From Swiss-Prot:
<dbReference type="GO" id="GO:0046982">
    <property type="term" value="F:protein heterodimerization activity"/>
</dbReference>
<protein>
    <recommendedName>
        <fullName>Jun dimerization protein 2</fullName>
    </recommendedName>
</protein>
<dbReference type="GO" id="GO:0006357">
    <property type="term" value="P:regulation of transcription by RNA polymerase II"/>
</dbReference>
<feature type="region of interest" description="Basic motif">
    <location>
        <begin position="74"/>
        <end position="96"/>
    </location>
</feature>
<keyword id="KW-1017">Isopeptide bond</keyword>
<keyword id="KW-0832">Ubl conjugation</keyword>
<dbReference type="Pfam" id="PF00170">
    <property type="entry name" value="bZIP_1"/>
</dbReference>
<dbReference type="GO" id="GO:0005634">
    <property type="term" value="C:nucleus"/>
</dbReference>
<dbReference type="GO" id="GO:0140713">
    <property type="term" value="F:histone chaperone activity"/>
</dbReference>
<dbReference type="GO" id="GO:0006338">
    <property type="term" value="P:chromatin remodeling"/>
</dbReference>
<dbReference type="GO" id="GO:0045444">
    <property type="term" value="P:fat cell differentiation"/>
</dbReference>
<dbReference type="GO" id="GO:0045599">
    <property type="term" value="P:negative regulation of fat cell differentiation"/>
</dbReference>
<dbReference type="InterPro" id="IPR046347">
    <property type="entry name" value="bZIP_sf"/>
</dbReference>
<dbReference type="GO" id="GO:0000122">
    <property type="term" value="P:negative regulation of transcription by RNA polymerase II"/>
</dbReference>
<keyword id="KW-0805">Transcription regulation</keyword>
<keyword id="KW-0804">Transcription</keyword>
<comment type="similarity">
    <text>Belongs to the bZIP family. ATF subfamily.</text>
</comment>
């Protein structure tokens, strides 16, 4: 018999096989008054064979209501803390993403400005070379001592020209 089940009224001490009247006690149902005066030895002998039927004499200890409430309260607090932490994590991630997006846009603008500046400097260089080449025939300085940018072996200028 499982705890919480109602005992079968058809099962009595006299109907159990091999038990018969238990150690001198009558097979009829015992009253509280009769149990008070019964010999403890006889009572123990009567109760012991009933263990195979899973008869539970005591109540199973149930958790106290306040313990259940405390456990539920702890769960609620833990869930609330987790919810707050998750929101904080999402906000930090969102802020980080927005920061990286702004930084990316700023760097792209800077890159575009630098490319524009490179193009302007290339054009200015070409104009200066052209002016120098136009001026050379009229210049009285010896051409042996002056090197023009075309004849110089400047690796930086060569790299810029290749681009």
């Amino acid at each position: 018999m499982m705890p919480g089940q109602i005992p079968d009224p058809s099962v009595t001490t006299g109907s159990l096989p091999g038990l018969g009247p238990l150690t001198g006690l009558p097979s009829s149902a015992l009253t509280v008054e009769e149990l008070k005066y019964a010999d403890i030895r006889n009572l123990g002998a009567m109760i012991a064979p009933l263990h195979f039927l899973e008869v539970k004499l005591g109540k199973r200890p149930q958790p106290v209501k306040s313990e259940l409430d405390e456990e539920e309260e702890r769960r609620k607090r833990r869930r609330e803390k987790n919810k707050v932490a998750a929101a904080r994590c999402r906000n930090k991630k969102k802020e980080r993403t927005e920061f990286l997006q702004r930084e990316s846009e700023r760097l792209e603008l800077m890159n575009a400005e630098l490319k524009t500046q490179i193009e302007e400097l290339k054009q200015e260089r070409q104009q200066l070379i052209l002016m120098l080449n136009r001026h050379r025939p009229t210049c009285i300085v010896r051409t042996d001592s002056v090197k023009t940018p075309e004849s110089e072996g400047n690796p930086l200028l060569e790299q810029l020209e290749k681009k």
